[in-house]
Every structure is written in structure tokens, then in C-alpha cells.
Amino acid sequence: MSSYFLNSFSGRYQNGHDYQLQSYGNAASVGEHFRESTMLSTRYGYDYTGIDLSMTRSNSNLCGDSERSTNYLQTASNTFHNSSGVKIKSPNPAFCSGSLISPSDSAIKMGANITEPSHSYSGNQDTSPVNDKHPKGTNSPKPENGQLDKDPALQMQIYPWMKKMHLNQEGLSGLEGKRTRTAYTRYQTLELEKEFHYNRYLTRRRRIEIAHALCLTERQIKIWFQNRRMKWKKDNKLKSINVSPPGGGFQP
């Protein structure tokens, strides 16, 4: 096959014999000194045994993470050198240990530069930032009654609509449990007596008119008429008893 290649090359060109074929040597004698300057070095090269033959690997590939990987590379290079004669440079241990820094080491160095918190606790003190006066297990002391009166924030704010107000009284009546007794004036009493003399029962419309005229509420007008009717019934009952005959018995 080689003779056919040479013959075809010589016959195709007129001066074929003048061209000299470049000898690249045997496969066993391949090394760095056979590489030309214009040739790009391969980044990954493997032979039939699976050993990496590339000379331009990165530092992370040249230097292993442990002694086990370094010993493996040295053993593999020695075995391949004995079998094929190719020289493989072993990584420099000083370069691996000094120049390369793992990400974990850099993170540790960066963490060491972080400033510590200003509040440091000694061994005898509690590490929790809880006030010593009020331990975690005990409840905070409740303010006393005198303190409630002095502190406006702790006092319950009372709005005007929370208080009861009487129309006849000026100001507020406070928070008494019982309603104060309504004191009617002579004019109010006279007008109510006149109305009761004509009508002992009031309609809703008439009650509203009287309440507006006398400056009273509907409830006050209603209560006054109820009391006035009870008094009128009591007076009529006493009159009926006094008018009855002295025998008081049934007469056929």
C-alpha cells in the first residue's frame, strides 16, 4: 500500500522525486521536541491505555486534591514510560501546595476577616440577650394602680359617646350604673298635666311633638304618662271604695 502511495505521488507531479517526505519518527519516540511552533497543542490527549497525555492541562487537573491522586498519576506515568518510552512530566508538589487554594480555604480566610459583634458575652454570663431583671421563666411585673393613673398611655380613653348625657343637665353624668332621676320643671309638669287631662294615651306622633316642645325625650314622655296613669287608677280605686254602701253585701 505504501508503494502505491509513493508511485502515485511521483507520477502525478513532474518533479515528484525532488520532494522529500518528512519523517515523523516512530510512535515510541514521540515527544515535545518533535512539535513545531506553528502547531496547536492538543488540550486533551488519551492513548489506548486511558492515560492523559496532554501537556497543557489546567492547574486544577495537574494537581490532585489528595495524595492519592498524585500517587496515581506518578504510578501511571511510570508504567506508560516503561511500556512506550514517552516521558510525562509529573506535577510539582510545591506548585500544587503553594499556588492553588481550594474554595473552602478561601471561604475560611474571608470569614476570618469578618468583624465580630460589639456585644461579647463572657463564659459566666448567659448568652441570651434577655434582661437580667426579668428572667425568661418569670412574667414581667404588672403596673400598679397609681402608675396607671399617672401614665396616660395605660389609661382607658373614654369618648363622649361612651358616657350618658342628660338633656336637662349640663355636661356629662359619668358612668353610673343607675340612671339619674329626671327633675321636671313646673312648666314641663303643667304642660304634661294638660295633655293627660285631654288624652291619657298618646300616639307616637303626638309624643314626638311634645318631646320637641318641652325639650324632653320620647322615653321620658312615655315614662311620665305611665306613672301618671298608675296614679290615676289608684286614686279612682280609693274613690270607688269610699262611695260604696256601708253594708257592702248583695241586695236582691
Curated annotation (Swiss-Prot):
InterPro entries: Antp_homeobox (IPR050296), HD (IPR001356), HD_metazoa (IPR020479), Homeobox_antennapedia (IPR017995), Homeobox_Antennapedia_CS (IPR001827), Homeobox_CS (IPR017970), Homeodomain-like_sf (IPR009057)
Motif Antp-type hexapeptide in this chain: 158-163
Cellular component, GO, one term: nucleus
SMART domains: HOX
GO MF annotation terms: DNA-binding transcription factor activity, RNA polymerase II-specific; RNA polymerase II cis-regulatory region sequence-specific DNA binding
Keyword presence, Nucleotidyltransferase: no
The keyword DNA damage belongs to this UniProt entry's keyword annotation: no
Start and end residues of each stretch annotated as Disordered: 114-151
UniProt keywords, alphabetically: Developmental protein, DNA-binding, Homeobox, Nucleus, Transcription, Transcription regulation
Subcellular location: Nucleus
Family of the protein in this entry: Belongs to the Antp homeobox family.
UniProt-recorded name of the protein: Homeobox protein Hox-D5
Organism: Heterodontus francisci
